[in-house]
């Protein structure tokens, strides 16, 4: 058993060791983007308890799906990204569909981070938006360029700092004398369904699982621990921020972005702290999403060794340039199309991991030290597909319905 797991065939993607801390940091960094600052506004109608319920449900089933991918990766000798795993265990169509979903999700996220960072640095430093975006993008690209280990190290430091900043501002919110938890603790089930859709799309770290499996092949039993711990920390952070904001403002006065609410309630220091947190959140997510997309490109197009300079230049150009161009080319309709594709990708990421796991158990290369437990039962797999599909259908109906006048 142990010998089989140690026998790895390296292809274009090389084995790079990650520690448990680094793997957890990558998951938290990927999930906690600047979108966390809008959750209070999204949950204002339904109430915080319903948000927590949906975050728990979405987080649980997303974690199950991630563990399916983890076992599939550990059953494969050669380190592969999602397209390679899908091609091996589902077929070429599955590989193409999952690559499209990865690209749509990654580009959509990086467009948001590029524009968002430009706006924040414009506010903080007085730079033009494009210059702020460039100042943000350069260090992001450098970390992605140096690969998985560099990403893990920087995620560890930056995610830790991000959590500390968030902890300071949340604690200050409750100690300010202006917070009243009863303002957040209400429930209106009429608005529950839209919030479920929002909760599901808060978790985007699924795409990073093959990278984590590649980095933890030397300690396969720690891979599920990293995934579960990373997702748990993510869920706590996603729940605590809206609670703090709604406790300060109430549903009637909550702002679309939490930075404004904190600034109005706590003062300028909170506004700046929240903006710095938002920059950190966007940066950690950019590293995880960008690094994942880069290796997906290498895997999908079967490029030469990922460490080959020419290969890396091509892959990083394909990863970095489209988001920056889209962010400042005024192609709003195209960005909207990417958002739709990302929704479609959510459905693909609910179905393909199920097929992947079931086929990997039949024709995988090796028997791994760790396997999924009861949560790989067909009934649970069916629930994952149904929940993700319903969320996507609701999203489509919401944005195709005519707006009320």
Positions of PLM-derived features:
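Hydrophobic transmembrane alpha-helices that form the core helical bundles
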Residues: 64-127, 271, 275-302
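Extracellular loop-to-transmembrane helix junctions
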Residues: 40-71, 78-79, 83, 233
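TM-loop-TM module centered on a large, flexible mid-protein loop between adjacent transmembrane helices
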Residues: 80-94, 231-283, 342
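Helix-loop-helix connectors at the membrane interface of multi-pass transporters/channels
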Residues: 6, 10, 84-87, 114-135, ...
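Conserved small/polar residues in nucleotide/adenosyl-binding loops
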Residues: 399-405
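Helix-loop-helix junctions that connect adjacent transmembrane segments
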Residues: 7-14, 129-135, 139, 147-149, ...
């Amino acid at each position: 058993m142990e010998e089989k797991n140690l026998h790895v065939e390296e292809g274009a993607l090389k084995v790079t060791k990650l520690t448990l801390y680094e793997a957890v940091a990558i998951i938290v960094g990927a999930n906690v983007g600047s979108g966390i600052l809008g959750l209070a506004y999204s949950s204002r109608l339904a109430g915080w308890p319903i948000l927590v319920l949906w975050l728990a449900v979405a987080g649980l089933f997303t974690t199950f799906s991630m563990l399916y991918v983890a076992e599939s990766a550990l059953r494969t000798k050669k380190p592969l990204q999602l397209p390679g795993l899908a091609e091996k265990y589902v077929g070429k169509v599955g590989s193409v569909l999952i690559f499209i979903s990865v690209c749509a999700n990654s580009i959509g996220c990086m467009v948001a981070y590029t524009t968002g960072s430009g706006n924040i640095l414009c506010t903080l430093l007085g730079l033009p938006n494009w210059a702020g975006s460039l100042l943000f993008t350069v260090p992001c690209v450098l970390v992605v360029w140096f690969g998985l280990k560099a990403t893990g190290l920087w995620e560890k430091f930056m995610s830790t700092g991000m959590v500390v900043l968030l902890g300071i501002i949340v604690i200050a919110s409750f100690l300010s004398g202006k917070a009243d938890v009863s303002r957040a603790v209400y429930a209106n089930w009429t608005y529950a369904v839209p919030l479920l859709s929002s909760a599901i799309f808060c978790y985007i770290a699924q795409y990073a699982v093959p990278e984590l499996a590649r980095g933890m092949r030397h300690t396969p039993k720690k891979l599920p621990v990293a995934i579960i711990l990373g997702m748990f920390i993510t869920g706590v952070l996603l729940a605590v921020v809206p609670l703090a904001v709604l406790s300060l403002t109430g549903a009637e006065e909550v702002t679309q972005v939490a930075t404004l609410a904190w600034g109005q309630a706590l003062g300028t220091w909170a506004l700046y702290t929240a903006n710095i947190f938002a920059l950190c959140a966007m940066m950690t997510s950019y590293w995880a999403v960008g690094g994942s997309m880069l290796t997906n490109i290498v895997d999908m197009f079967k490029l030469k060794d990922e460490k080959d300079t020419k290969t890396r230049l091509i892959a990083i150009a394909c990863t970095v340039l489209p988001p920056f161009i889209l962010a400042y080319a005024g192609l709003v309709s195209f960005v909207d199309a990417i958002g739709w594709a990302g929704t479609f990708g959510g459905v693909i990421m609910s179905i393909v991991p199920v097929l992947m796991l079931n086929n990997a158990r039949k024709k995988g290369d090796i028997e791994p030290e760790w396997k999924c437990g009861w949560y790989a039962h067909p009934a649970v797999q069916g629930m994952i597909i149904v929940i993700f599909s319903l969320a996507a259908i609701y999203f489509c109906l919401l944005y195709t319905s005519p707006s009320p006048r």
